[in-house]
Each structure stands twice: as C-alpha cells, then as structure tokens.
Amino acid sequence: MRDTTRRLESGRPTWRFPRAFWTGNAVELFERAAYYGTFIALAVFLTDVVGFSDVAAGWIGALFSSSIYLLPFVTGALSDRLGFRPSLLLAFTLLALGYGGLAFFPTQGAVPFSLALVAMGGAFVKPVITGTVARSSDGASRARAFSLFYMMVNIGSFTGKTVARPVRALMGVGSVPLYSAFAALAALAITALFFFPRENGEERPRSVAQSLEGLAVVLRNGRFLALILITAGFWAIQGQLYASMPKYVLRLVGPEASPEWYANVNPLVVVLLVVPVTHLVRKLSPVASIGVALGLIPLSALVMSLSGNLQGPVRLFGATLHPVTVLMVSGIALQGLAECFLSPRYLEFASRQAPPGQEGLYMGYAHLNTFFAWLFGFALSGYLLEAFCPDPKVLAARGLSREAMAAAYAHAHYLWYAFAGVGLLAFLGLLAFALLPGRRENR
C-alpha cells in the first residue's frame, strides 16, 4: 500500500493502485452485471410481462434510465458527506430490494416503485465508484485508471447480458430481475467485507444545497453544457441496444433470436480495444477523440438499417444467419469501436475538473449527457417501434391476416434512419463546437 502511494506521489504513470481502487472496480462489475442483465430485458419485460404498450414502455424506460444520471446531483453530495463505504452499502441494499420487487411483483402499479429503488441505488454507485477511481490516481495515471475502470464496466455488462439470455430462454423474461437481485446481494457482501476507501477527512464536503448551487454555476458554462448535449447524441443511439434492438430483433427474427448476445458484441469490442485505443489517442485533445466517435456512431445506425434491403438468409463462415442478425452485430461492433474513442477521454476530462473532495458530485454531473440521451432516445423509441415495428400481439388483436401483419413490418428499418439523423446532428454540432473560440476542453 505504501509502495503504491509512493508511486502515485512520484508523478510517474503507473498501473498499480490502492486496494480500494480494485475493490471498487470489483463491485462495479457485479453492479453492472445486475443492471445490464435487467436492462437488456426491460423493454420486453414491460410489454410482455407487465402489459404496457410500446409507447408507455418507452416513457417508463426513459424516466427510469435517465433518472440514474440525474439523481447523482443529490447522491454525489450525500456520498461525499456520508462517506463512500456507507453510501455503497446503502446503494446495494436498494438495488437488491428493487430487482427483487421487479421479479416478485411484476404489476403495473408495483413496477414503477421497484424501478425507482433501482434508480436510487444506481445513482449512489456511480459517483462513489468514479470518485474512488479519481481519488486513487494522480494526474499522470488518471487516464490509465479510468481505462481500467471502463474495462471493468464492460466486463460486467458482458457478463450480465450473457447470463440473461439463458435465464430468459429457460425461465422466462420475468425471471431476469431475480438474477440481478442475486448479483446485487453479492456486491453488497463484497462491499461489507472488503471496501474501506481512504476518505478525504481534511476536506469538509458541501451540503446538498451548496452542491446544487455549485451545479447551477456549472450549468451556466455554455460550452461545457454544449459538450454535454452534443455527446448525448452518441448515447441516444447507443441506448437503442436496450430501447429498440431487443424488440426489433425478436419481432423480425423470432423468439429464438438472442438480442442479449448481440448486444454483448459492444462490451466485447470495448474490453478488447479500450486500452490500446486509449494509448493511441493519448496525444489527441478530448474533442478530437470524441469527434472520431461521433463520426462513427451514425454509420452504425445506417449499417443496422440495411437489413431492410437484404432478402433471404446470409451464409457467413459456413453458418446460415438471418440478415437482421448479421447487420445488427456489425452495427453494434462499430458502436463499440466508437465508444472506445469517447468514454475514457471524456471521463478523464470530467474528473480533472473536480475540486478536492467533490469527485462524487462532479462525476455525477459528467454523466448528464446520458440523462438527456436516455430520456430522449427511449421515449422516441416507443413511438418509432409502434409506427414501424409494432407489437405482434397488438396486430393479432386487430384480426389482421398473415399478409397484413407482414406488411406492417415492411419499413421496420426506418427506425434506424431516424437515429442515424440524430448522430449526424451530433457530429455537426461538435464541428461547430470545435470551430468556436475558447476551447477550454483542450487544456
């Protein structure tokens, strides 16, 4: 521990970090496995198990997923005052209760309450873990620390969705949240036994009111807010892995499809490439690296849309695949590559803006781009699904013939055109951002 501290204080880049860093990353893996296991199934769960329409499910998913990125404005300040360890214990208790509620009480009245518990628990986890990463690294090693953190996030994401597929196939989509509840309990046990971070006792944390006042000052920084909104375009498309893709695939390919595993291509690509890409772009400014990501993300949506132009199965490496499968996987892989250029540099930039003792609050603000993206992307998804890729149960209830039902899906791929347009607008916005004077983000 002392050797690690000396290395950090030396100002030289290092891959060695204190125990709290590694323990925090371990529980982050379990939390992400729990979250993404349920998140990949949520859109289908809300319609097929709970009975909501596509539009209602889209709005519920939008409010749930976006609130996880809004609540840290409050929970970040609370975690700084309560301490990171008590905050994390509270977080995993809320998560276990929330996921358990989804599994045992899947009704339209109870599900929103259970999702609120999950959102509150997740909102505590985010600022605590990212704050721990920031406190456990110095300026010379911070990019490495966040690249390792982001790798663990994606390993957890990969694991959660990998397990969700057999759970859905063998026990039904309604049982997926039960798996997430067990993962949250495992994270709670690890936190209780092993997570003892060094608190910044010499710094007096702000109150919630003071933190919100500080947030108002930050929000008046037009350039940083513009960067938040521009990068939200990236995450609005990325969010369709959970909002649109599962229903799109299951409705066009059939129940034997594996949207959970298709979505896993994204974290697999990130795990394999995030460290080398971080090394590759280390001399680029944050805006230049983000620009590469925003150039790739609309292309990924266009690749997904090409399924509407292919007829019949595709033979690839000796296997016969549905064209939707081939193009979904290709587009998702491209999204993973784009994410490697965006996320580590973006988090690095945001963490460098944090004042002493306030990493939790400021890192919560850094994720505000995902708040806007999830709120917009999930809500839009519900309307696009209803228009171009409707629920087959709704069509059957209308008494449509087989031919009429097939015609209802003829333009399903138009959904991806809409999100390609969102990505293009984000890219053009970044170009304008880079050309305007006063580029503080390059510092």
PLM feature spans:
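Symmetry-related core transmembrane helices of the 12-TM Major Facilitator Superfamily/SLC fold
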Residues: 174-193, 409-432
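Glycine-rich segments within core transmembrane alpha-helices of 12-TM secondary carriers
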Residues: 143-168, 183-184, 366-381
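Conserved MFS/SLC helix-loop-helix module at the cytosolic interface between two early adjacent transmembrane helices
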Residues: 70-106
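Intracellular juxtamembrane helix-capping segments at the cytosolic ends
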Residues: 124-138, 249, 341-355
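Juxtamembrane intracellular "pre-TM" segments in multi-pass secondary transporters
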Residues: 2-18, 201-228
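Short amphipathic helix-loop junctions that connect adjacent transmembrane helices
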Residues: 40-56, 243-260
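C-terminal ends and interior cores of transmembrane alpha-helices
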Residues: 93-107, 295-320
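Helix-to-loop junctions at the C-terminal end of transmembrane segments
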Residues: 71-84, 168, 272-292
